[in-house]
Curated annotation (Swiss-Prot):
Subunit structure: Homodimer and heterodimers.
InterPro entries to which the protein is assigned, alphabetical: CASP/CASPL, CASP_dom, CASPL
Transmembrane annotation, as ranges: 70-90, 118-138, 153-173, 208-228
Keyword Cell wall biogenesis/degradation part of the UniProt annotation: yes
Free-text function comment from the UniProt entry: Regulates membrane-cell wall junctions and localized cell wall deposition. Required for establishment of the Casparian strip membrane domain (CSD) and the subsequent formation of Casparian strips, a cell wall modification of the root endodermis that determines an apoplastic barrier between the intraorganismal apoplasm and the extraorganismal apoplasm and prevents lateral diffusion.
Main location: membrane
Family according to the record: Belongs to the Casparian strip membrane proteins (CASP) family.
Membrane topology (UniProt): Multi-pass membrane protein
Membrane topology (Extracellular): 91-117, 174-207
This protein's name: Casparian strip membrane protein 1
NCBIfam families referenced in this protein's UniProt entry, alphabetically: A_tha_TIGR01569
Length: 231
């Protein structure tokens, strides 16, 4: 007995899926990261950079504040150094003294310009006092603009020159003052301060004031070097 079977024909296509005539193929969508998970690293990065930026800004503000304080101290020291320099120049220039012996026709006179060291001392202190007055506007600019490193460097160089000038003048005058007070027996130089008290007092005070100005200039140089190093 024969039976008839129905054959099932399965069509086979040679075309790739997705082309025209090919059966549609369902594809699963690609997995995507959740919005919350994607936004979490960005938020964390923003939180981590915000304190850094705030700390950096605070550091620069503190640095400018410290530089401004140093510049203001520099301004005050220049005013303080002006007094001793001017006093030394005036004391030396007005140290002349006349000593009368027996009559007015026999007089001994001590003048500062008879000693080159005292003349040098007066000129050096006058130059230093004038320089300090001229440097005050530049120092004020540095107070208002702490980042002006060029002005600090210029003042540092000029202050160093003033230190050398005043030190040389004060040292030379100190040697003459010591000789005027004590004399020199080997050279047969007699001490004159026993007779010319006013002359010796004024010149001695001028020497002390000059060394005080040198000390204040040294402080100015140290402050300027420290401020430039911070920059």
């Amino acid at each position: 007995m024969s039976t008839s079977e129905t054959a099932t024909v399965i069509p086979v296509y040679d075309v790739a899926p997705g082309q025209q005539g090919a059966p549609a193929v369902d594809r699963a969508p690609a997995p995507s990261a959740p919005p919350a998970a994607a936004a979490a690293p960005a938020a964390a990065a923003a939180k981590s950079t915000a304190p850094r930026r705030f700390a950096a800004g605070r550091f620069f503000r503190q640095s400018d504040r410290g530089s401004r304080c140093l510049a203001f101290l520099d301004f005050l020291l220049r005013i303080a150094a002006f007094g001793p320099a001017l006093a030394a120049a005036i004391a030396t220039g007005t140290s002349d003294e006349t000593l009368s012996v027996f009559t007015e026709f026999f007089q001994f006179r001590a003048r500062f310009d008879d000693f080159p060291a005292f003349l040098f001392l007066m000129v050096a202190n006058a130059i230093a006092a004038g320089y300090l007055v001229l440097s005050l506007p530049f120092s004020a600019v540095v107070v208002l603009r702490p980042q002006a490193t060029g002005l600090r460097l210029l003042l540092l160089v000029c202050d160093t020159i003033m230190i050398g000038l005043l030190t040389a003048a004060a040292a030379a005058a100190a040697a003459i003052v010591e000789l005027a007070h004590n004399g020199n027996e080997r050279a047969n130089w007699v001490a004159i301060c026993m007779q010319f008290h006013g002359f010796c007092q004024r010149t001695s005070g001028a020497v002390v004031a000059s060394f005080l100005s040198v000390f204040l200039f040294l402080l100015l140089v140290v402050l300027a070097a420290f401020a430039i190093r911070k920059r």
